[in-house]
């Protein structure tokens, strides 16, 4: 499930980092089982809905380091840039304007790269 949502390159990089860190290796294994093996794999919500909920939760929690990867995942799952924008704007009412503004800034490069790639122009990532 993790590879399906986040993509091979992200997962390969994260697994290599976890393998190189004996202190947090067990925690990473636990987090992956709970997140991808139990939560994202449950019935009842489709992956697009789970992805939008994740963007909201990360925005409310101020977890900007995870937002870009999950925006990229949302786009991979067929969520449109407009749906991402509306999700972040909706979250602003609950997370606060500064948190939402920071979320927009964190997500903008991923959405821009996606739109650029869809338009046929070379994809540019910062």
Where are these regions (language model features)?
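Acidic, glycine/proline-rich low-complexity segments that act as flexible tails and inter-domain linkers
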Residues: 1-47, 76, 102-126
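Gly/Ser/Thr-rich beta-alpha loop segments that engage phosphate groups in nucleotides
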Residues: 9, 64, 98
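Short alpha-helical scaffolding segments that buttress acidic/His motifs in well-ordered protein cores
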Residues: 31-35, 52-59, 87-92
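Substrate/cofactor-recognition hotspot
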Residues: 51, 97-98
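Mid-chain, well-packed structural core segment of small domains
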Residues: 52, 56-85
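Short Asp/Glu-rich motifs
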Residues: 93-94, 111
């Amino acid at each position: 499930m993790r590879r399906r949502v986040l993509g091979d390159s992200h997962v390969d990089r994260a697994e290599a980092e976890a393998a190189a860190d004996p202190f947090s290796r067990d925690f990473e294994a636990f987090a992956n089982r709970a997140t991808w093996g139990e939560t994202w794999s449950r019935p009842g919500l489709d992956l697009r809905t789970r992805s939008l909920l994740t963007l909201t939760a990360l925005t409310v929690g101020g977890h900007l380091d995870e937002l870009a990867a999950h925006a990229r995942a949302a786009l991979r799952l067929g969520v449109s840039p407009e749906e991402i924008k509306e999700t972040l704007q909706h979250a602003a009412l609950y997370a606060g304007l500064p948190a939402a503004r920071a979320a927009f800034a964190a997500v903008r490069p991923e959405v821009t790269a996606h739109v650029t790639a869809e338009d046929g122009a070379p994809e540019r990532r910062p």
